[in-house]
Amino acid sequence: MSKKGLIGVQMSTIAPAKMPSFEPFEVMGRLTDIGFHCAEVSQVPMTKENVAGFRKAIDELNFNISSLTASIDPMFPGMPGEYLSNEDDYKKYLDDARTLNVDMFRIGMMPMNAIGDVQKCIGGGITPPYSNNTVIYK
């Protein structure tokens, strides 16, 4: 991928909930057709099939996944999902990121119990002031 800056698409704008059928390779192909070559993956279930579809787009379309959206903890206690605070989920996040050549996670929103508590934010990997809530891992 070029070293030039890229203008991409945030997947939440075309996520599965907004489309009757969602197949990552097909969607990335359509984005490529209209001039986009980069996306942040957000609000897309990271199933094996979806990760494989994104990987295929990287390999065959020269598509770039700039970042993945991640959650530190459930927004509310008991809320289902994958969270960086869970060791197995954390490993899956890292595996998905490595598979997709991604080195950034975007934290969309802190859990409700951390809002207004700088120490909880720092403990969750966010350094105030946090611009776009991005956490870079290496």
What are these regions (language model features)?
Residues 12-14, 28, 36, 69, ...:
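Tryptophan-centric aromatic hotspots in well-structured domains and transmembrane helices
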Residues 15-21, 41-53, 73-85, 112-117:
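Acidic-and-aromatic substrate-binding clefts and catalytic sites of carbohydrate-active enzymes
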Residues 5-11, 39-41, 65-70, 105-107:
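Hydrophobic faces of well-ordered beta-strands that scaffold small-molecule active sites
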Residues 60, 64, 79-138:
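Active-site acidic/histidine proton-transfer and metal-coordination neighborhood
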Residues 23-47, 96-104:
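Catalytic domains of carbohydrate-active enzymes, especially glycoside hydrolases
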Residues 1-23:
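Boundary/entry segment of secreted carbohydrate-active catalytic domains
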Residues 48-69, 129:
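Aromatic-lined substrate-binding rim segments of carbohydrate-active enzymes
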